[in-house]
């Protein structure tokens, strides 16, 4: 009986180690908690994110231990990629956003229009209206498809006055 318990404990420990390795170095599940990526990713969507696409850092490990500030086997993401990162403010909160700027790019929002490297990003209204939950209020806003200079596109959300409203600003280390 004691041998069987020891075998079961070993099996559980091996399973936990394998799960930790997969989650840390291969794929990690994420949950979409807000409407900031609608209509592409909806509230409640679940997805697996590749951990090896852009290399490894201390954030690849659970609890982001301060072992190193370097990134290993790194590759820069491309403009238009959906990325997951930890905000530098608390180093714990995961954000899922679309990348529109690369190192060296200049990004400006002038009168509600997006400029990338002094180039006004052209936008076409998408034939949908998005409902965004803002506390106790639900906003109906228009969605626009914006064409980036390298041919990739992303969806930006504007309010009724035409001002971009999904303008979260983060500086994310390479």
Residue ranges: model-predicted function:
Residues 10-27:
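Hydrophobic membrane-insertion alpha-helices, especially the h-region
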């Amino acid at each position: 009986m004691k041998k069987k318990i020891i075998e079961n404990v070993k099996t559980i420990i091996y399973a936990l180690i394998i799960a930790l390795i997969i989650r840390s170095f291969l794929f990690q599940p994420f949950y979409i908690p807000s409407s900031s990526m609608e209509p592409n990713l909806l509230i409640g969507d679940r997805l697996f994110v590749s951990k090896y696409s852009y290399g490894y850092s201390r954030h690849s490990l659970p609890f982001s231990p301060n072992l190193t500030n370097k990134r290993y086997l790194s590759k820069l993401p491309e403009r238009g990629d959906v990325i997951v990162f930890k905000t530098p403010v608390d180093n714990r909160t995961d954000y899922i956003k679309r990348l529109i700027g690369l190192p060296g790019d200049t990004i400006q929002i002038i009168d509600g229009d997006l400029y990338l490297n002094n180039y006004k990003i052209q936008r076409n209204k998408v034939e949908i209206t998005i409902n965004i939950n803002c506390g106790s209020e639900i906003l109906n806003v228009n969605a626009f498809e914006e064409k980036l200079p390298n041919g990739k596109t992303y969806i930006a959300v504007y309010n009724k006055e035409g001002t971009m409203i999904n303008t979260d600003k983060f500086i994310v280390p390479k």
